[in-house]
Design a protein with these regions (language model features):
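Juxtamembrane/interfacial segments at transmembrane-helix boundaries in multi-pass membrane proteins
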Residues: 50-88, 188-246, 276-294, 342, ...
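Helix-coil boundary and interhelical linker segments in multi-pass alpha-helical membrane proteins
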Residues: 92, 138-144, 277-291, 331-351, ...
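Cytoplasmic/organellar membrane-interface segments at the starts of transmembrane helices
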Residues: 386-388, 441-533, 545-557
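Predominantly late transmembrane helices and immediately cytosolic-facing juxtamembrane segments
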Residues: 243, 357-361, 426-460
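Membrane-interfacial loop-to-helix junctions in multi-pass inner-membrane proteins
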Residues: 22-39, 119-132, 144-150, 168-189, ...
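Alpha-helical multi-pass transmembrane bundles of energy-transducing inner-membrane proteins
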Residues: 23-25, 132, 136-224, 309-322, ...
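Transmembrane helix-loop-helix hairpins at membrane boundaries of multipass inner-membrane proteins
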Residues: 1-2, 16-128, 204, 209, ...
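Central hydrophobic cores of alpha-helical transmembrane segments in multi-pass inner-membrane proteins
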Residues: 4-19, 33-46, 101-115, 133-134, ...
Length: 557
């Protein structure tokens, strides 16, 4: 039942915010705060209560891949919805779900706080759309029925379209339509793949269902599997986004209001990575294995292209948007490396990118509200005018380039080490992208905040509300940088189940022999990442499943 509340609380708060906002805009804002903070508090409580379960070694609930998936669940609910078509209201939660749900509610709350003074028209309707988006995103991350997943996947497009089109900037309608068309067209390809998988499984087994656990291991030809995998990949590649289907993202970010950019960067594009990890790879492991090299090429292109394009921007917000293209290239690289270190790095990257890039979008939005421009040619020396803003911007710029000691460094380090195990050339080229990240991050600071102030700007520094938001994000990035173990332990069972269920395809194979000698202890793939606590220290990936782990992973052997 608790899983339903994660969807129902923001969904119920949405019309409340709209109605209350018609009388008093302040009530709409506070309703939105409650609608995002309440499920976040509920989730944190569940996370703390489930600490022992998350630390335990993975135990499959049944035979095969489905048993491995179910073994990592913390909670689930499944009731018939459209029974004649085999559609169930099927929600489940594991460590991966906890992480992405926390991002959804946390970034949703930040989006509301960041818009506290910036949104002055149709305030109630605005917060209705934000809460609708949050509820739909929660549904996406909890769904284990592919039809239900697609339902929520499409449902979130509508409120985000209105957020951009109604409250965006000069070219907001163009950006909103482009965002909608890209996502809708690619989503239809995924729908075709889902329906095809439904009929293939039904004809083979007599069980027509959209249930994810039943569809695992569906028998089909390699050509069919590859084509269906491409249908899923198209939808998730657009969301991530992957070059060359990324062009909607800079426009959407540039024209969206601050809240829209925070949700886009912090949560919405993470659906692409989540969908690949949760559905695409487990359903079509051999096809993904065959597609590994082209995908890694696209990932490396995205890393370098996004960084180079960021360097060439005059618009500060568009620069930050292109950094997301580069950072998500690392995510794609880690997904197709598909080993413990890479996958744990991907999950850390999703979190740290959400915090650092979300903070930069809040910073840019606040700056635009003060000086009414995003053109860096009209900036320079702003640190002298607003030193707290300048220092905060420097911190998040350093986080974005992967400064050691911050969470982004740990994430990229794990991804590159994991990638090296399967593809040395991809790891080397991906590491080269970090050099470009340094260039665009420091160039941004030089053009906007350093140098002499020659334009006569005079504006207020960060407010207490802004300082509070940035302080929370800074603390989170520093904490993850020095002690990422809570996140690693939270996701270790999910990573273990994913790696084991795809092992037969060779996707999760290591360069070393994977079969232990007779009488040796079984290897727990998830335990490998337990030695990565600290700022990237320790990368052993051969740890006994019997290793004793202190609360939330403190002290592996």
């Amino acid at each position: 039942m608790i899983l339903l509340w994660y969807i129902l609380i923001p969904a119920a708060a949405a019309p409340g915010a709209w109605l209350l906002g018609r009388a008093r805009p302040g009530l709409a804002r506070w309703t939105a705060v409650v609608g995002t903070a309440a499920p976040l508090a509920l989730l944190v409580g569940q996370w703390l209560a489930s600490a022992g379960t998350l630390r335990a070694a993975l135990a499959a609930r049944g035979p095969g891949a489905a048993g491995l998936v179910e073994g990592a669940w913390l909670a689930h609910v499944r009731v018939p919805w459209i029974a004649p078509l085999g559609i169930d209201f099927f929600l489940a939660e594991d460590g991966l779900t906890i992480i992405v749900l926390a991002l959804t509610f946390g970034l949703g709350l930040l989006a509301v706080l960041a818009s506290w003074r910036g949104i002055t028209e149709r305030v109630g309707f605005f917060h209705f759309m934000i809460l609708w988006t949050v509820a739909a995103l929660a549904g996406v991350f909890l769904s284990f029925d592919l039809f239900l997943f697609y339902f929520f996947f499409e449902m979130m497009l509508i409120p985000m379209y209105f957020v951009i089109a109604v409250w965006g900037h000069e070219r907001r309608v163009y950006a909103a339509i482009k965002f909608f068309l890209f996502t809708q067209a690619s989503g239809l390809l995924m729908l075709v793949a889902i329906v095809a998988l439904y009929f293939i499984h039904g004809r083979a087994t007599g069980d027509y269902t959209f249930g994810f656990t039943e569809l695992l291991g569906t028998r089909m030809s390699s050509t069919t599997a590859f084509l269906l995998m491409l249908g899923f990949f198209a939808a998730f590649a657009v969301k991530l986004p992957v070059v060359p289907v990324h062009t909607w993202l800079p426009d959407a970010h540039t024209e969206a209001p601050t809240a829209g950019s925070v949700i886009l960067a912090g949560v919405l594009i993470k659906i692409g990575a989540y969908g690949m990890i949760r559905f695409m790879v487990p359903l079509f492991p051999q096809a993904v294995h065959d597609f590994r090299t082209p995908a890694m090429i696209l990932a490396v292109i995205g890393i370098i292209y996004g960084a180079v394009m960021a360097y060439g921007q005059r618009d500060l917000k568009r620069l930050v948007a292109y950094t997301s293209v580069s950072h998500m290239g690392f995510v794609l690289l880690g997904i197709f490396a598909w080993n413990t270190l890479a996958l744990q790095g991907v999950l850390l990257q999703l979190v740290c990118h959400a915090f650092s890039t979300g903070a930069l979008f809040i910073m840019v939005g606040g700056l635009q509200d003060r000086i009414h421009t995003r053109d860096m040619d009209r900036m320079g020396g702003l640190w002298q005018v607003a030193p707290r803003m300048g220092g905060t911007a420097m911190f998040f710029a350093l986080a974005s380039l992967g400064l050691p000691g911050l969470g982004n460094f740990v994430a990229e380090f794990l991804i590159l080490i994991g990638t090296w195990q399967v593809s040395e050339w991809a790891a080397v080229l991906g590491a080269a992208g970090l050099v470009f990240a340094t260039v665009y991050a420091l160039w941004m600071m030089q053009r906007a905040f350093q140098g002499e102030e020659t334009h006569g700007w005079s504006f207020a520094d960060l407010t207490k509300r802004e300082v509070g938001m940035f302080a929370a994000l800074i603390a989170a990035l520093v904490a993850i940088g020095f002690y990422p173990q809570p996140l690693i332990t939270t996701s270790r069972q999910t990573v273990a189940s994913l790696e084991r269920m795809t092992a037969a395809s060779g996707l999760a194979a290591r360069p070393q022999a994977a079969t232990p000698p007779a009488g040796a202890a079984a290897i727990d793939p998830a335990a490998a990442a337990d030695n990565t606590a600290g700022a990237g220290a320790g990368t052993s990936n051969d740890t006994s499943a019997g290793t004793s782990v202190a609360p939330f992973g403190g002290g592996g052997q």
